[in-house]
A protein has these predicted regions:
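FNR-like FAD-binding dehydrogenase module
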Residues: 1-294
């Protein structure tokens, strides 16, 4: 399943991607999905045309055609002279994998990702985001593996948690909050930032339902383009400095997920200013300041 999360947004399109496992797959809240992308059909056929190759050429193993074998190969590398399709393939490396924070927990029976489209200098869709949001057909198999991410795992008790994120970083926080609500742990606080509330409030209905049922005790939203002066997540943190200190005194654990440039560094500085560098470092060493940033 593939749904646009931000119609008419000022930012690039962001999608809710839902994948169904073909066999038992286990992950924990906070884990990462490593996706093996494939080339678009158009990209493969352009490559075949450029090198005057027949898509239906059978390879030496007799199992695959050339067009099938090129699906997960890096087609951007320079090519040396070759005599056969197999000699060509020997020159091509596999496409690199792409990592995404998982937004769901196994009991939901779906592996959910939040993927924003990225574009290169030529205006072409990025490798991972293009594959997941545009090129892969609905119902097509997606190759992935789960990467254990213990440094961002959920604590196994009912201490308060403070979740801080922006944009697609909400994904990793949603998995934590889904897990907490299943356990009926209610001391949860979410800070979320995006551009405009009308267009970029990802998973609004779920978040507001948690709030109305008491599963989300506090919610602070920062929509930067909804007022003349831009407001970001770190501004909201500073506004709530005294309440934040109270939660930390109650042994709260801080989780930060999202862009390392801008949000995560600004949040880190705000936390240093509010709590002091010494206390923030103590929280880090105690496993009470956890980050999944990219």
């Amino acid at each position: 399943q593939r749904d646009l999360l931000n119609p008419n947004s000022l930012g690039a399109p962001a999608f809710n991607i839902e994948l169904l496992a073909q066999h038992d797959v286990h992950w924990s809240a906070g884990d990462i999905a490593e996706i093996q992308p494939e080339n678009s059909t158009a990209r493969i056929h352009a490559f075949l045309k450029q090198h005057q190759l027949d898509a239906n050429t059978i390879l030496a193993d007799g199992q695959q055609t050339l067009v099938q074998a090129l699906a997960d190969k890096d087609l951007t590398a320079p090519i040396q002279t070759f005599k056969t399709a197999d000699e060509l393939l020997a020159q091509l490396s596999p496409l690199p994998s792409r990592e995404y924070s998982i937004a769901s927990i196994p009991s939901q029976q779906v592996l959910r990702l939040v993927v924003r489209q990225k574009f290169d200098a030529q205006g072409e869709l990025g490798l991972g985001s293009g594959w997941l949001t545009a090129h892969a057909a609905l119902g097509q198999n997606i190759a992935l593996r789960i990467r254990n991410n213990p440094s961002f795992h959920l604590i196994d008790d009912d201490r308060p948690i403070i979740c801080i994120g922006n944009g697609t970083g909400l994904a990793g926080l949603m998995s934590l909050l889904h897990a907490r609500t299943r356990l009926n742990y209610t001391q949860n606080w979410l800070f979320f930032g995006e551009r405009q509330q009308a267009h970029d409030y990802f998973y609004q209905h779920t978040i507001e339902a948690w709030q109305s049922t008491g599963m989300l005790q506090r919610l602070d939203l920062a929509f930067s383009r909804d007022q003349a002066e831009k407001v970001y997540v770190h501004h909201k943190l500073r506004e709530q400095a005294e309440e934040l200190k109270r939660w930390i005194e109650q042994n709260a654990v801080i989780y930060v997920c999202g862009s390392i440039q801008g949000m995560a560094s600004d949040v880190d500085q705000a936390l240093k200013d509010i709590l002091g560098e010494t206390q923030l470092e103590q929280l880090r060493q105690q496993g009470r300041y956890r980050r999944d940033v990219y």
